[in-house]
Structures are given as C-alpha cells and as structure tokens.
Amino acid sequence: MSDSSPLPPVRLHPEAELARDALSTPLLSRAARLARWAGPDTRVDAGGGLVDEQVPAAAEILGLTGDEAAADASEAWRVALDTGLVEIADEDEGTVTAGPDLALLTGGSPHDVLAVWQGALETLIADASVPDLDGLEEALDEGGELDFAQLQWDPEAEAEFLDGVLANLYLLSVAEDGPADSPVPLPALAASMIVPSDMGEPTNDVLEQVSDAMMKLDDQFRLLEPVGLVEYQPVDEALMADTDEEPAAQVDDTDVSRYGMVRLTPLGLYGLRARLLEAGFTAPAVGDLADKGADALLDGTATFPQRAAQAETEQWLARREPLAAVRELLAAARGLDAGAPLRRLRCQQALSLVGAEAEPALREVLDDPELGGLARVWLAEHGASDVPPPSEAMIFWLTVDTVAAQLAAEGNSEELRELVEGLAQQHSGFFTAAWRVDHPSTADVLEAMGRLHPDKRIAKEARKAAFKARSQHGG
C-alpha cells in the first residue's frame, strides 16, 4: 500500500461516543482502576512492573481469577504506566504516583480520552508483535541479551507484518464494496499478506504459510480484543487439536467462521486511522471537508466513492444556507483544467441534494458555456418552466464534459462503456460534430470512445475524430 495515494474515506462515530467506548474497554478500565488503587505502599521493579508480591492484590482488585489473572493484571499495570495514568516517583525506592493523564479520563475532553486510549492501543500492538517467549532462558546469550536468531524472531519484520495486516483490515472495512459491518474471515486476511495478487492456484508451500499466519493472527487478535480494537471470534480449538485424536463431536469443515472471524470496531477504525495518519498516509474521514470551501469539497470528493461523496456533501450542505451554497458550488465548478470535468460532475451530484430554493442560482448560469448544460438538466428534472433549450454546441460540450468526468472518476468502467455505445447509437453523426467541440478533453474523450466501443467500424470513426481534434488544437 502506497502512502502517496489517498485511502477511501472512513465514516467515524462522534468522538464523545468513541470516548465512552474507550472508557468501557476491559483493558483501559482495568488500567484506570489500578492507577487509582496504587498508593504509597505500591512497589515496582526496575522495569516498572509491579513486584511479584503485589500482583495478586492487583488481580483481586480487578476481580481476575484463573490461570491468566496474574498476567492480565500485569498487562493492565503496564498499560497504566505506558499511558501516563501512573508514574514512577522514585526509581531507587520503586514508588509510584498518579500520572497527569489519570484525571483526563474523568475531566478531559473526548479527544483527551481517546489520546489516552490510543496510547494503550500502541502498547498492545507492540506486545502483539512479540512471540511467546516460553523458551526465553535458552535464548539468552552470554551477556544476558536476547539472541533473536535463536528465537527465529525478527522484531522489525514482525511489527511490519502486523502493521500490514491491520492496514489491510482497515482497507477492507472502509472500502465501498467491502464487507461493511460484516466480519472478515481470518484465512482471507492472512492470505492478503501471503498470496501474491497474480497467483492463480496457491501452492502447498503458500497454503502452509497462510496457515502459519492464521495461527499467529489468532494469538494476536485474542490479545488485541480487550483494548477494543476488534471484535474477534477465535479459531475453533478443535481445528488445532491433535489429528490423531477423535473429535468430541462432528465438525463442519465448510463453516468458514470456525477458522476465525475479525471485525474492526468503530473505536478500532478511529485508532487505525490515527496510526495511518501518523505514518504519513492520506486517510480522510467523512466530515473533514464540512467547514471548508466549495472548491475544497469538489476537489476533495473527486476520488471518493459515490456513497462517501454524497455523505460528505450532505454534511457540507447542512452547514450552509441552500441558495448561497449552490452559488458557491457553481463558482467552484468552473474551469478548463484537467480536474474540472470531475468537479462539475460532483457539483451536479451535489445539486441533486438541494430543493427548489436553488432555482435562482441555476437560472443565473444558463448562459454560462461551462455550467449552462448542467443547469438545464437540473431545472428540467425539477419541472421548471421557461427554460431555454440548449444549443447544439452546448449539448456536445456537455457530452464531452460528462464522458471526461466519468473517465476521471471510474476509468474504463462498464458504465462508461454503455454510455459510449449509447451516444454513438443515438447520434449517427456524433463523431463528425464531436471533434470540433472546443473542450480541452475532446481528443482524450474520442480516443477513449474508440478504445471502448465494441464495434470496430465505430471505434475507427472515433479514433479518426480524435486525430482531427488533436490536429485542430495543434496536438
């Protein structure tokens, strides 16, 4: 994934709602309880962790029992320390004090709360990249340092792998044609990191790598769920049982959910977007343009999928008086630069969201060579009377502008192919007139029509017309 191309826009929940979600996550709520529990008698070791004698008391405060109680309590303490909920007061004595961020959980803004939660998320993601170190003592070298080679662990590669998985999960979650609120099967997520995009049938070696990645991700998502990043259905334990053992019950190997299912929470979307922004990606959120000018709206939504563009435009319109908003949109839609056709298309889509109060602004541009065509379309759709018919030159100019916008928005899509076929079918002399249209994109549009039209004779006519258009403009 390149950090130069914008990611699809994400629809985030309000910060106040996300802050409430953050405070209710098991991990942050435990960290906060331990921070408030800590007092003058609390002691930490050289690494800042609770001394062994105090871990049981911490687990009891949190209501934790069972084999994982001590580990979960220690993890909550580490999060409290990493996020500034507690601070080490005296390293030599091992004493602690309340950190400056503890008060933010009750007295700070939603953004303050989310910043604390983001710190907890970073701690957990870092922890998730660390393998199970049961054989840690055997991996210590003579100087007491970890021998990563013996552990077969590359910290940088492991962190990059998890970052890549989370980025892919984010992309799947925000894609217009993605799974939306549906969970993503763990095998599909693992395969997105392992299987080359141009590979047909995966080899046995690749399938084994996918299986290993699934098992790794199963451990990692179990660890990340308590911080509120994901909702996770783990891999069915029966799948990991010894194959020589008889299964306790009949299992359905076709049930993909048994192989793990993961879904980003609204809080998780917020957190991963923040990480992507920090890493230098352009990761827009719907609503980012609501307080900006019409030029920023039309340019900014140019690459948005249609539903996201509409949602962004609705928020933009909601903050403005309709007639003034329409005038601003029309002014921003003017231009003969390469991006202008797509701006006019987005303007036309925005105009479909306003009512009859916009009519005066549309009538004002009826004689405008760039806007008169789309103004007539809007007025006709709204049943306006006394609308002068467009000239033939305006009709052809609008046609070229529309195809240029579709090319910019979708490339060689099936929808554009159908539009091209329809134009050639409805106007027998289309190419004879079209090459004369005084539009910067005329030659490009005619070349595209020649490329897209399935009829070889008509495609040849389009290419000839494109050549004439370029010759006319000295190209």
What annotation goes with each model-predicted range?
Residues 67-82, 208-236:
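Short amphipathic alpha-helical interaction segments
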Residues 1-206:
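Short, amphipathic alpha-helical interface elements at domain boundaries
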Residues 235, 288-289, 296-301, 328-338, ...:
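Alpha-solenoid HEAT/Armadillo-like helical repeat scaffolds in large eukaryotic proteins
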Residues 315-317, 377-430:
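Alpha-helical adaptor scaffolds
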Residues 221-223, 294-295, 322-335, 355-366, ...:
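Amphipathic alpha-helical scaffolding segments comprising HEAT/armadillo-like alpha-solenoid repeats
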